[in-house]
Design a protein with these regions (language model features):
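Electrostatic interaction modules used in gene-expression and signaling proteins
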Residues: 1-131
Length: 131
């Protein structure tokens, strides 16, 4: 349930949207030919939706209920590099995703923990991979 009046909620949404866009250097995606802005917008809106949830609630991440406060904290740590990483992962995913919203929430939640290992694996593959 959303507390307050509709204008209050809209203002809160706009404030979170601006904050998230600032964190991820949103304007840098405007001219990025590798990233579709609609994809970035979808991620931003999904994060905004979570930011509006009450802290005492839970969000399902990879099938596990996580405290909203922890998910919000994780989302607020995401930056431009994390969003690029998520978009790269999405583009290279070849398996069918049944619930795209759940998949994106999990990807956003895990991005800060998995980005370093992902790029290490990519470099190792490029340097020492199958030839």
């Amino acid at each position: 349930s959303i507390h307050g009046t509709a204008p209050d909620v809209m203002e809160e949404m706009d404030a979170y949207r601006d904050l998230i866009r600032e964190h991820i250097s949103y304007e840098c995606f405007q001219d990025d030919r590798f990233c579709r802005r609609e994809d970035v917008d979808e991620l931003v809106e999904l994060m905004v939706e979570v930011m509006l949830l009450p802290d005492h609630g839970t969000v399902r991440i990879a099938g596990v209920e996580k405290p909203v406060a922890i998910v919000k904290n994780r989302f607020m740590k995401l930056n431009h590099e994390h969003i690029e990483y998520i978009l790269t992962c999405l583009q290279s995913n070849t398996t069918k995703v049944g619930n795209i919203k759940a998949y994106l929430l999990t990807t956003l939640y895990n991005a800060s923990m998995t980005i370093s290992n992902y790029y290490t694996a990519e470099v190792n593959h490029d340097l020492y991979g199958s030839g």
